[in-house]
Regions:
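Short hydrophobic/aromatic patch on the recognition helix
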Residues: 174, 178, 222-223, 227
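Terminal helix-turn-helix DNA-binding modules in bacterial transcription factors
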Residues: 180-218, 240-249
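N-terminal regulatory/effector-sensing and dimerization cores
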Residues: 2-94
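Short, Lys/Arg-enriched N-terminal segment that forms or immediately precedes the first helix
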Residues: 16-19, 125-133, 175-182
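Compact structured core domains
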Residues: 60-62, 66-149
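DNA-binding recognition helix and immediately preceding turn/loop
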Residues: 137-185, 206-215
Length: 249
């Protein structure tokens, strides 16, 4: 069991998990993630037998990997693909590959690092060359994200056809636009969005069954399958140790 209070902070376009977690299985998700070892080095596996032990790493959306904290306290910063930081990282991922080890700039004491993490201050945490100017998100994709992130407010519009008609595009054109703007498929992002919404439900109720319903999953078994596919871990191993869930406006 974790030795410290694990915490989860969720914002509209970013999330932070801090604490001790088990090693994951192979998985990929529809958002880039910054991994940081707060108390020591972790192991990261990807590709055809590639492995690094490091104190920090960036993993692009859609890249299959295995993360082993090796018992250390870690921080995981998930950036929605439309966030300014995620968009500014797309260029360096395209040039250097989907996994970038040892990306953190020297910050100093662990307390300072955790302060920057809680503020989601990536420019203070990462080497400057990693973050580059990116064009604004297409407003049609931005409108579809508003619907995807609030499924209870738009029943029946979460299917590809409904989202496409909402921005006056054909389904195939919308699919192409979404992937071009977000870097991930609509299908992958829809699952990711549901899992995030389910985790936000933990701020209201600690029961995983209630979280599954909050995420618009058919049942807790469906939620569990999608969670394992997304994070490579069971929901209970990650969410039950949480002592604090904070939702940001």
């Amino acid at each position: 069991m974790p030795q410290r209070a694990n915490t989860l902070t969720l914002g509209t376009d970013r999330a932070l998990y801090v604490g001790e977690i088990p090693a994951t299985g192979w998985h990929c998700h529809a958002s880039p993630v910054l991994l940081m070892g707060l108390s020591g080095r972790f192991a990261l596996h990807w590709g055809a037998g590639r492995m690094e032990t490091c104190r920090s790493a960036l993993v692009a959306a859609g890249v299959e990997h295995l993360f082993d904290p090796r018992g250390e306290v870690v921080a995981l910063v998930y950036l929605e693909p439309d966030s300014p930081e995620a968009r500014s990282l797309r260029g360096v991922f395209q040039r250097q590959g989907g996994v970038l080890p040892d990306v953190a700039a020297p910050v100093g004491a662990r307390a300072a690092i955790e302060g920057h993490l809680r503020a989601f201050d990536l420019p203070a945490l990462l080497h400057r060359y990693l973050l580059q100017a990116a064009p604004p998100l297409d407003p049609r994709v931005a409108r579809s994200l508003h619907v995807l992130r609030r499924p209870q407010q738009a029943p029946g519009r979460l299917a590809r056809a409904g989202l496409a008609s909402g921005v006056q595009l054909s389904a195939s054109r919308f699919n192409h636009l979404f992937r071009a703007e977000m870097g991930v498929s609509l299908r992958s992002y829809r699952v990711w969005s549901q899992v995030r919404l389910a985790m936000a439900g933990l701020a209201v109720s600690p029961r995983l069954t209630d979280a599954a319903l909050h995420g618009d999953f058919a049942d807790s078994a469906h939620f569990s399958r999608m969670f394992r596919q997304t994070f490579g871990m069971t929901p209970s191993s990650v969410l039950k140790p949480l002592k604090q869930v904070t939702l940001l406006d």
